[in-house]
């Protein structure tokens, strides 16, 4: 059997960002509206700092207005919620994103509850989650939205396909399952405590791995020809000892890529698969929010 088709999330995301930039330019020219995204980061988490910097750069590159609020690790919950309230009320901001994780003394649930659902571009509020589950228009979480685009591009019509989502988080697993269900797939949500996980996964035409366990999904778990979407990211020291000593890392997904690509029909790499789609879909959500808040959409 031939190796799996490589799903190039980087190229797909670049095309999506170009389309968004065109729409942003048209929105400015026709309505005088510039979509604005504010990202709030609490603390010094290195991975979060990279994500936040990338979000800011890509927001600006798409022609949008970008704000980044960097708060110290010692910021209290009340101080953070005050920043969120200010951004909720700011007319030039259409999307508000608090970068998670936040320090342990701050409740992530309380932060999400404080976000205006109209500006909740991560799709985490109860309002947006409920709308998504009910099949109503919603600002949906960015990573599963990006995954759906890649799956549709790889397969086309999803009706009647069997899908297994490994992972049950509010940010990824649950909304991913809702989206696949809305596309008329038969969906199973599995997780690290599911019994006989390999046999569950082996039934699937579509596998979405989002559990955060490096290379957990092996070749003998995967049905020949299946589409495999790897959302997991685990950092390991670089293979080269000198690079590792210098603090360099390598990213590994939830799928044992080298062996699974010999079985699957299509597969996303890590990095370069799902990751670039997440920020592109964040920009798309910000554009949608700007249109809705301006009475255009």
Swiss-Prot record:
NADP(+) binds at residues 167-169, 192, 233. Keywords: Amino-acid biosynthesis, Histidine biosynthesis, Hydrolase, Methionine biosynthesis, Multifunctional enzyme, NADP, One-carbon metabolism, Oxidoreductase, Purine biosynthesis. It comes from the Bacteria. Pathway: One-carbon metabolism; tetrahydrofolate interconversion. Its EC number is 1.5.1.5, 3.5.4.9. GO terms for biological process: L-histidine biosynthetic process; methionine biosynthetic process; purine nucleotide biosynthetic process; tetrahydrofolate interconversion. GO terms for molecular function: methenyltetrahydrofolate cyclohydrolase activity; methylenetetrahydrofolate dehydrogenase (NADP+) activity. The keyword Hydrolase applies. GO terms for cellular component: cytosol. InterPro entries: Aminoacid_DH-like_N_sf, NAD(P)-bd_dom_sf, THF_DH/CycHdrlase, THF_DH/CycHdrlase_cat_dom, THF_DH/CycHdrlase_CS, THF_DH/CycHdrlase_NAD-bd_dom. It catalyses: (6R)-5,10-methylene-5,6,7,8-tetrahydrofolate + NADP(+) = (6R)-5,10-methenyltetrahydrofolate + NADPH; (6R)-5,10-methenyltetrahydrofolate + H2O = (6R)-10-formyltetrahydrofolate + H(+). Belongs to the tetrahydrofolate dehydrogenase/cyclohydrolase family. Homodimer. NCBIfam families: PRK14186.1, PRK14188.1. Catalyzes the oxidation of 5,10-methylenetetrahydrofolate to 5,10-methenyltetrahydrofolate and then the hydrolysis of 5,10-methenyltetrahydrofolate to 10-formyltetrahydrofolate. PANTHER family: C-1-TETRAHYDROFOLATE SYNTHASE, CYTOPLASMIC, C-1-TETRAHYDROFOLATE SYNTHASE, CYTOPLASMIC-RELATED. This is Bifunctional protein FolD.
